[in-house]
Every structure is written in C-alpha cells, then in structure tokens.
C-alpha cells in the first residue's frame, strides 16, 4: 500500500529532527485529484465578484454563479429573519422591564406583533384604560387569527395562550394547544379537513406521547370514527411526531414499547380501513372526491425506520421493513438505506451494514449512494480501523463524481487518525497516514481555516490528528478556539432565551460548552508530546502555513476580548503561543483537567460538599447493616457527583489519558499524586465504610446505653481484628472525596505496572500486584465475561513478566509463565523481552521451556481455528 516517498530535510544537529514519511495509497493506479467542497454555505458579497465579467459561453461558470447567488439570497433572508426576531425581542424586553404584570401581558403582545408605538407610559395607560382598549383587542385578535382559524380559536378561548405558544415559530409549544383543545367539549368536531391540514397537521410538531394520543382521539372524533376517512395527512402527522420522540434509556421503562405499540395500532387501523374500503367498493367515491384517498407512502416508512433506529432494536426494524414491503409494496429509498446502515453500525453488525451499502450500488440509479452514505461507511471504517478500505471508498467517490462534503472529509480524517494510533492496524505507517489525512483536509480550505458550517466536527477531526501526533501546540490552540467560541454562543443564547435582566446560570452554560471528546484529545496530545520531535504538520508547506495561522490567531492573553462573561470565560492556559517544556505540559494539563471537572472553575473539588460529614454520619446511624450503609453512601456520592462535578469529563477513558501524561514524561511523584487524587480502590472503600459504620454505632451505644440500635456490644466484638481501622475524620474525608474519583479497574492497574517498569520501582509493582489480586475478588471483576477476564489477566501477567525481566529476576518471570500456562495463552510478543535476555545469558534450558509453552499454545490455537473452519 506504499506510494511515493516524500523528500525530507536532512536531520539537524541537536535534539530536533525531521521525519521521513510515506503516503499509503489504496491501489497501484495513480488517481487524479480534484477540488472538493462545492459551493460554501456562507457566501459573502465580495466572493460574488459582481463587477467581474462572465463568460456566457461557459455553462459551468454560469451554473456556478447561479448557485452562488441562490446561496447568498438564502443566507441573506435567514440573517434578516434572525435579526428581526432579535430586534423584536430586545425591544420587548426593554419596554417590559418595569411594568406591572397586567401591562407586561398587553405590551408583550403589542411589541412582538409589531403594533407597538413609542408613546410614553402615561399614554399607554390611557390607551388601556380609555376608549381605545377595544381597538387594541381587535388588533391582537387579528394577529391571533393568522396563527389558527377562528373555529379553533373559539374552542381554545385563550388568545394569550395561543400567542405565547405559537408566536415563536422556532420554539412553538403545540402541547399546550392540543391540551386546551382536548379540554374543550367540541374538541375538533366540525373543523374542516382543509383547516386541519393547513393549521395543525402540517405545523404541529414536538408533541409528547400524551398529546399525540389526545390528537389522535380528536381526529377520530372529527371523522365520526369512520376509519375510511382517516386520510394520509393524519397518518403522516401522527407518525412524524411519534418518530421524533426521544426513547427512554431506562431498561425497565415501558415507554419505548408504548410508542411502538401506538405505531403498530396505526398500521393496523390502516389495514382495517383498507378492508372496509375493499368491501364497500368506495374506490369510485375516492376518485370523485367524495372520500379522501388513503395510502401508505415513503414518508411514513421513513418515520418508522427512524424510530426503530433510535431503539436499536433489530426485530422492530425488520418488522417495519417486512410490513411495508409485503403489504404496501414500498421499498426503502436511498435515505432509508443510509439510516439502516447507520443502525447496523451502531449495533456492531458491520457485515450487514456493508451488505446494505453493496445493495444500494446495484439496485437502481435512484438508490445510488450519495455523500451522506459514503460518510456513514467511512465512519464504519473508523470503527474497523481499516484505512485501506477508507481510502478506496474516497477514491470511489471521486471516480463516480460524487462530490465529498465537509462531513465526508472529516470522517476520512478521523479514520486515518484513529488507525495511526494503533501500531498493528497502521502497519507501521502511522506518520504517513496522519500526513495523508492533513493533505485530504487541505482539499477544502474552508475546513482548515474553520470557516465552514462544520465547526465542531472539523475541530474534532483536526484535534484527533494533533492528539496522536503529540502536537500539543496546535491542539491547545484549537481547543481554546472552540471553547471560547462555543461559550460565547451559548452565553448569547442564554441571554436571548432568559432576557438581559435574569442572572446567567454559568454552570449550565459551561456544561453545554465543555466537549468531553475534545477534552480527551487535548489530554492525549499532552501525553504524546515530545520536546525533541517536530510536529508532523510542518512536513509540507501548506500545513506549516495552516498551523502558524491557527496558533497565531489565538488570544491567550485576552487582549482583544470584549466579553460580558468576564473572568468566567477564561481558560487556564499558559500565555504562550507554543509549549516547549515538559513542566509546562504538567502544569497546564492539571489546570485544564480541574477546569473541566469544576464546570469552568465554578466549583472547588478540594472542598467537601456542604454538610457532608453530618449527612454521612446520619446515614451510618440509620443504616440497618453495613451493606445498607454502603448502598446509601454510593447513592449520596452519585448525587454529589451530578451536582458538583462535570461527570461528562470525568470518565475511565479520560482519567487513563490524564494519568499517562506524567508517566510518559517520567514524573513519578505527579503520577502517584494524580492516581491517588482521582481514583480509589474497592477494598479501600469497603474498609472506610466498615470503619465509619462501626465507629458510629459504637458511639451511639456509648452515648445512649439503653438506646435501640442495630448493633450490639457482642456484634462489635465479633468484628475481625484484622480489619483496617480508620479514624472518623479520615473516613469522612475519603468518602466525601469520592465525588471526583473513579474506581480503579484492570486498565489502571496495568498502567500502574507500566509506571513501575518506567520508574523501576519494585515497591510500586508489588503494591499493584497485591491490589489487583484483591480487585479480582470483587463483583466488578467477577461479573465480566470469562473471555474478557482471561484477556485482562493475560495483559497484566505480561507486564509482570516484563517487570521481572527488567529487574533481572528471570526465575520469577519464568515462574509466572509456567504457573499460568493453563489459563493464559502465551504468545511470543508477550515474552519477547524475556526471551532476548535468556538468549543473551545462553540459558538454553529456560529458553527451551519458554518456547515449548509458546509453541504449544500456538499449535492448539491453530488446531482450534482449523476445526472451527471445517465446522
């Protein structure tokens, strides 16, 4: 897969050097390249070049200019509409600031509806109290009639509710309207089909399941429960709102089945209606317009597939596909197949996703995969870590003249970046893959300059490349750019929704601003940083210019920031354009870590939750047993974590990356400090729980000998003397600190063993060995599948062998291998270091034993694979 080699500069003297890279190609044939991206969504007046003469003989140039003008007109109309909404809302807020509740209601309607005239307060009161009150009511009523027909308004009988619910078309509340109609005795009876279709069926959206059921009942009542008159628009309205419902994540909840049951009942209703129609021979009436024609269509199938994909339920997906194909002769279209491919990808059924993709290519021209489909399949290549197939797919798009979108390029870049981080999947071409990804990204200048509409997705793709390359300078610049931009946007959105006079909930603003994926990529860039290595992006001219522009465009000193948010909008980053010292990496990584966990510095992790000591003591005093106390404490810690700590940033993956930073930089003290501060062991937790529980119960018995407690003196004496005892203060402090700690799992113990190897610390290795032995007895480990437990045991045992090999304790290393050969499949990469040392020592006996164990397992594995293939 190797293509041409790039010419590299000669290595310079000193620690810095430039790297030679190779660009992998998907095939031997050289493919022509072309610019991608098409017409940008954000077209400015300058880019239209209105004064430039057009070549009327060139149809491509005319088509290009026409597309530009259409996009510019569309953007201009959108900007005008947004500006009008902002002006109206700001005017309403200013005018309504100091009014009474009655004045607020009247003036809000007048300002929003555009009937506000700039008289002073006395004149407005005169209008309300004087003879012009009727004209104001008539004006408001006239505006309300534009939202709903008069027949429906009379049944709602609340113009203020209609205005409040529907005046903002971006955030309309149809649930309130449906609920009010349902409370009316007339409901929707007698309302014409035309009025229903134009004002409700085509506009009502974001309905809850309860509102959908109410609307369905009212629609049935409107047609006197004659199922043959339940038309297509009604079906589309119900299925559309059902498909937009958010599924419940609670496995015990029946909500998802309720939604699915409603969909099934609608399909059964349609089938029943078709039987009635066939029996009454009403086809002629339908043709004459007496009875509406009812039929299932592609839109309804789209809704069913959409909701089934949200549920991640294969049986329900197959049920809908089979039903529409067999009974209604409706096959999925291109968009449906793309959703189904995404559905199979989420479930991990990769083979079925590829089958769907192959089917689309050979069905018909209408089913031909588009850029969205190719983007979906590139994301699947990312999960499979198959860079060759990803490159082939992209070249296939070019050959078939399918213009790649920014999303397509980002998906390809993420795939190449992910594969480059895996030494096995990258086949030794990690740097070449990352350089190739940067070159693909530069095919669209709007992407690398962050001018496209895919701001977040593009930064995510670029940061993935920086993370695996260790380019901390560019990664921190991109992270800074994203956070400051996103914070400003979220802050302005909050002001628009809540008004300038309400206090800002900075915790919610920061929670929606801090992206855990970008945060982990930044930590990974810190971890992979090496002072003596030049960033790979400097390997070609365009990349060097892009990197320089992005870094220089960041204002770490906030000299040019004019932000109402004040100091809360500032990130704890060093005021340096680039980082050159390991100490700077350690300091900044810790500061950014704390900043993310503390919701932008709004909380302090070092401070225990308010009243935590009293809460824990009360729980211990009221608990009936240690198990009951442990359960209640874990529940309380979960509440603290939700309220105080950004749990999106604190997860097992991010803490592994965070601990890797000092490990790779050789900072033992910082590694141990971070591990103890942000992780805990299950056995330590149980010891503190037991100690606090026993101390609290003993204090109760001592203070009130005659009191009724759940623990007696004899039970206290029965407690094992070997149980580690902590004083009350230390137990309370430990349990309170668990709000920002992650329980240690096999991955953390493996990282600890790597640290012992890195720092040549025998005490740390011994402690890790003993602690993991205790961890293996916990339910968290025992509940894992047998294959996964064996895999984790093998990984840790391999690290132990490497440690003993480094310490020249070859007998102990051989002892581990021989003792575990019945449970662990030892392969040569796991014992490579030990084998090399034994060869140097010419220990032929140990070499023979070692290779027999390795070869025996290899032969048995090969035999098992052969039997499986024959079966």
Curated annotation (Swiss-Prot):
PANTHER family with a match to the protein in the record: OS03G0856100 PROTEIN (PTHR47447), PENTATRICOPEPTIDE REPEAT-CONTAINING PROTEIN (PTHR47447:SF24)
Location(s) in or outside the cell: Mitochondrion
Coiled coil: none
Protein keywords: Mitochondrion, mRNA processing, mRNA splicing, Repeat, Transit peptide
Region (Disordered): 704-724
Superkingdom as given in the UniProt entry: Eukaryota
Name of the protein in question: Mitochondrial 15S rRNA processing factor CCM1
UniProt source species: Lachancea thermotolerans (strain ATCC 56472 / CBS 6340 / NRRL Y-8284)
């Amino acid at each position: 897969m190797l293509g041409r080699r790039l010419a590299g500069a000669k290595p310079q003297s000193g620690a810095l050097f430039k790297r030679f890279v190779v660009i992998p190609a998907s095939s031997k044939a050289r493919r022509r390249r072309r610019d991608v991206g098409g017409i940008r969504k954000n077209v400015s007046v300058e880019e239209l070049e209105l004064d430039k003469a057009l070549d009327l003989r060139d149809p491509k140039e005319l088509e290009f200019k026409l597309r530009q003008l259409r996009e510019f007109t569309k953007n201009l109309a959108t900007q005008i509409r947004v500006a009008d909404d902002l002006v109206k809302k700001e005017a309403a807020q200013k005018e309504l600031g100091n009014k009474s509740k009655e004045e607020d209601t009247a003036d809000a309607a007048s300002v929003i509806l555009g009937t506000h005239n700039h008289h002073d307060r006395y004149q407005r009161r005169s209008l309300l109290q004087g003879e012009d009150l009727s004209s104001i009511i008539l004006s408001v009523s006239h505006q309300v009639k534009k939202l709903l027909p008069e027949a429906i308004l009379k049944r709602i009988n609340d113009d203020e509710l209609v205005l409040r619910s529907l005046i903002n078309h971006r955030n309309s509340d149809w649930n309130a309207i449906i609920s009010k109609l349902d409370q009316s005795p007339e409901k929707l009876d007698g309302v014409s089909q035309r009025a229903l279709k134009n004002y409700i069926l085509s506009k009502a959206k974001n309905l809850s399941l309860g509102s959908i059921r109410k609307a369905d009942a009212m629609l049935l009542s409107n047609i006197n429960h004659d199922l043959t008159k339940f038309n297509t628009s009604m079906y589309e309205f119900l299925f559309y709102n059902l498909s937009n419902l958010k599924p419940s994540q609670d496995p015990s909840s029946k909500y998802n089945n309720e939604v699915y049951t409603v969909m099934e009942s609608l399909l059964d209703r349609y089938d029943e209606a078709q039987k009635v129609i066939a029996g009454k021979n009403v086809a002629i009436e339908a043709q004459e317009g007496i009875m509406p024609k009812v039929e299932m269509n592609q839109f309804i199938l789209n809704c069913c597939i959409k909701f089934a994909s949200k549920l991640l339920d294969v049986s329900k997906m197959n049920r809908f596909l089979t039903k529409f194909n067999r009974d209604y002769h409706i096959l999925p279209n291109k968009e449906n197949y793309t959703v189904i491919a995404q559905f199979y990808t989420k479930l991990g059924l990769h083979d079925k996703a590829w089958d769907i993709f192959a089917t689309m290519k050979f069905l018909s021209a209408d089913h031909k995969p588009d850029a969205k489909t190719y983007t979906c399949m590139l994301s699947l290549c990312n999960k499979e870590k198959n860079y060759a197939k990803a490159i082939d797919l992209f070249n296939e798009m070019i050959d078939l003249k399918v213009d790649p979108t920014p999303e397509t390029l980002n998906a390809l870049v993420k795939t190449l970046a992910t594969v480059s981080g895996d030494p096995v999947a990258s086949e030794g071409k990690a740097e070449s893959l990352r350089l190739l990804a940067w070159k693909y990204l530069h095919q669209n200048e709007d992407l690398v300059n962050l001018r496209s509409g895919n701001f977040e997705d593009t930064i995510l793709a670029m940061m993935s490349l920086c993370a695996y390359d260790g380019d901390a300078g560019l990664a921190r610049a991109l992270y800074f750019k994203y956070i400051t931009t996103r914070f400003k946007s979220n802050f302005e959105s909050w002001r628009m929704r809540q008004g300038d006079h309400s206090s800002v909930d900075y915790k919610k603003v920061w929670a929606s601003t801090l992206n855990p994926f970008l945060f982990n990529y930044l930590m990974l860039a810190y971890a992979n940083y090496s002072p003596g290595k030049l960033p790979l992006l400097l390997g070609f001219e365009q990349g060097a210019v892009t990197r320089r522009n992005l870094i220089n465009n960041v204002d770490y000193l906030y000299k040019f920031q004019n932000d109402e948010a004040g100091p809360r909008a500032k990130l704890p980053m060093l005021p340096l354009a680039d980082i050159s010292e390991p100490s700077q990496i350690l300091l900044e990584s810790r500061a950014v870590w704390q900043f993310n966990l503390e919701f932008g510095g709004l909380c302090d992790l070092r401070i225990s939750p308010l009243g935590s000591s009293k809460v824990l003591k009360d729980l211990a005093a009221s608990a009936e047993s240690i198990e009951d106390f442990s359960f209640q404490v874990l529940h309380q810690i979960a509440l603290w974590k939700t309220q105080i700590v950004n749990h999106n940033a604190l997860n097992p993956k991010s803490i592994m990356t965070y601990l890797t930073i000092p490990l790779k930089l050789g900072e033992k003290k910082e590694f141990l400090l971070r591990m103890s501060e942000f992780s805990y062991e299950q056995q330590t937790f149980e010891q503190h729980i037991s100690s606090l529980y026993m101390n609290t119960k003993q204090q109760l018995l001592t203070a009130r000998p005659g009191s009724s407690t759940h623990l007696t003196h004899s039970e206290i004496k029965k407690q094992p003397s070997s149980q580690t005892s902590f004083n009350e203060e230390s137990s309370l402090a430990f349990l309170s600190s668990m709000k920002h700690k992650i329980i240690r799992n096999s991955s953390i113990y493996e990282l600890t063993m790597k640290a012992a190897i890195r720092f040549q610390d025998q005490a740390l290795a011994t402690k890790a060995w003993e602690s993991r032995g205790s961890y293996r007895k916990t339910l968290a480990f025992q509940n894992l599948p047998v294959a996964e437990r064996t895999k984790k045991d093998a990984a840790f045992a391999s690290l132990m062998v490497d440690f003993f090999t480094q310490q020249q304790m070859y007998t102990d290393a051989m002892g581990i291998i021989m003792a575990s050969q019945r449970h662990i499949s030892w392969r040569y990469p796991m014992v490579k270091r030990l084998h090399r040392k034994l060869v140097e020592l010419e220990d032929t006996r140990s070499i023979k034993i070692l290779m027999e164990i390795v070869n025996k397992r290899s032969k048995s594995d090969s035999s098992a694979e052969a039997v499986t293939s024959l079966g």
